[in-house]
Amino acid sequence: MRALTLLALLALAALCITGQAGAKPSGADSSKGAAFVSKQEGSEVVKRPRRYLYQWLGAPVPYPDPLEPKREVCELNPDCDELADHIGFQEAYRRFYGPV
């Protein structure tokens, strides 16, 4: 009984495999690649807000560092710059110019 069931399943599997091998895609599928989409369709799916993007890179624009002007002031003073290398910018700026 098991052999007969196994033989029937193998015959059914063989029919399914040979039937799919000879089948051709339908007219709707053959005109369009199912795995590929056009650039326009792809960009409609993945839309990003453009307000924070570099125009040439497509990466988000970094927010300006509020401490950058103070860091430049400390870099112009050789003593502050040297101390910043040892203890960090914020502490060196605080020691030379007051609170950050």
Swiss-Prot record:
Positions of Ca(2+) 2 binding: 72, 75
Cystine pairings recorded for this chain: 74-80
Binding positions (Ca(2+) 1): 68
Modified residues (4-carboxyglutamate): 68, 72, 75
Domain annotation Gla: ranges: 52-98
Keyword Disulfide bond: yes
Main location: secreted
Signal peptide: 1-23
SMART domains assigned to the protein according to its UniProt record, in alphabetical order: GLA
Annotated Ca(2+) 3 binding sites: 75, 81
Keyword presence, Secreted: yes
GO cellular component: cytoplasm; extracellular region
Propeptide cleavage-removed residue intervals: 24-51
GO-annotated biological processes: biomineral tissue development; bone development; brain development; cellular response to insulin stimulus; cognition; glucose homeostasis; learning or memory; negative regulation of bone development
Record InterPro entries: GLA-like_dom_SF (IPR035972), GLA_domain (IPR000294), Osteocalcin (IPR039176), Osteocalcin/MGP (IPR002384)
Keywords from the named record: Biomineralization, Calcium, Cleavage on pair of basic residues, Disulfide bond, Gamma-carboxyglutamic acid, Hormone, Metal-binding, Secreted, Signal
Post-translational modification: Gamma-carboxyglutamate residues are formed by vitamin K dependent carboxylation by GGCX. These residues are essential for the binding of calcium. Decarboxylation promotes the hormone activity.
Cellular compartments annotated: Secreted
Membership in a protein family: Belongs to the osteocalcin/matrix Gla protein family.
Protein name in the entry: Osteocalcin
Gene (UniProt): BGLAP
